[in-house]
Amino acid sequence: MNGYWKPALVVLGLVSLSYAFTTIETEIFQLQNEISTKYGPDMNFYKFLKLPKLQNSSTKEITKNLRKLSKKYHPDKNPKYRKLYERLNLATQILSNSSNRKIYDYYLQNGFPNYDFHKGGFYFSRMKPKTWFLLAFIWIVVNIGQYIISIIQYRSQRSRIENFISQCKQQDDTNGLGVKQLTFKQHEKDEGKSLVVRFSDVYVVEPDGSETLISPDTLDKPSVKNCLFWRIPASVWNMTFGKSVGSAGKEEIITDSKKYDGNQTKKGNKVKKGSAKKGQKKMELPNGKVIYSRK
């Protein structure tokens, strides 16, 4: 076991080193943390040095700018600016070095790490995904899992039915040219079910005497419509908007049918209002209907 642990420890050590900050990075982070805490989160080295061209300043301009600031903030002239001058000098040294300046510009663009003494210094905080993103991710994973499970179940059931049909055909001594009666029992105490092999097709005999074909094609194929991804929105639609749309359609049909019946009734009344033939007597019933007697 010791032989297996050594490579793992080496890899772990390399990974730890890859995530450790260099000395210059630590200096940059520390100075950036100090000036952003004192002057605001938008403060950076270029603004701190009061460079006219900011990030477009050349190395020569950055060095020359420090000489200009030294006339006012050098501690020999004013001791109270000692800490400020140290920061100005360090920022100038970092930006006047091309490789160090690239490092600073990278973190300035992509973000600086946070600082916490209890966590061992500087660290990058992990981005916390939003609630809707987590819910959407879980929703997608659940539906994909449900669809995969339905495919596995479908294939398993289809394979089981195909094997059962194959076993029944092996008992058919007519070679698919006649009819063979079989009895299927799951265990000895089972009453069993009657089966019929008719021209290579297997049927189960129902209690009422009808026959049902046993075929893997009768299984419902996996579909997205059977997943929650489709069923829940469809159910919500049917209970809300779909219900109102359906009832509106029914009302329209009923209204049209009433109009149609009314027209037919009027036409019928016109026919009934015809005069009686010769030899017929007109009689009015209590319900208002008018009839005519035969000749």
From Swiss-Prot:
Family: Belongs to the DnaJ family.
Region annotation Disordered: where it falls in the sequence: 259-287
Domain J: 42-110
Major location category of this protein: endoplasmic reticulum
Lumenal side: 21-130
InterPro entries named in the record: DnaJ_domain (IPR001623), DnaJ_domain_CS (IPR018253), DnaJ_domain_protein (IPR052606), J_dom_sf (IPR036869)
Residue intervals annotated with topology Cytoplasmic: 152-295
Protein purpose: DnaJ-like chaperone required for the folding capacity of the endoplasmic reticulum.
TM region positions: 131-151
GO biological process, one term: protein folding
Membrane topology: Single-pass type I membrane protein
The entry's keywords: Chaperone, Endoplasmic reticulum, Membrane, Signal, Transmembrane, Transmembrane helix
PROSITE patterns for this protein: DNAJ_1, DNAJ_2
Glycoprotein among keywords: no
GO cellular component: endoplasmic reticulum; endoplasmic reticulum membrane
UniProt xrefs under SUPFAM superfamilies: Chaperone J-domain (SSF46565)
Entry-linked PANTHER family: DNAJ HOMOLOG SUBFAMILY C MEMBER 1
Compartments in which it is found: Endoplasmic reticulum membrane
Species, as recorded: Saccharomyces cerevisiae (strain ATCC 204508 / S288c)
Listed Basic residues bias regions: 267-280
Name under which the protein is recorded: ER-localized J domain-containing protein 5
Signal peptide (residue range): 1-20
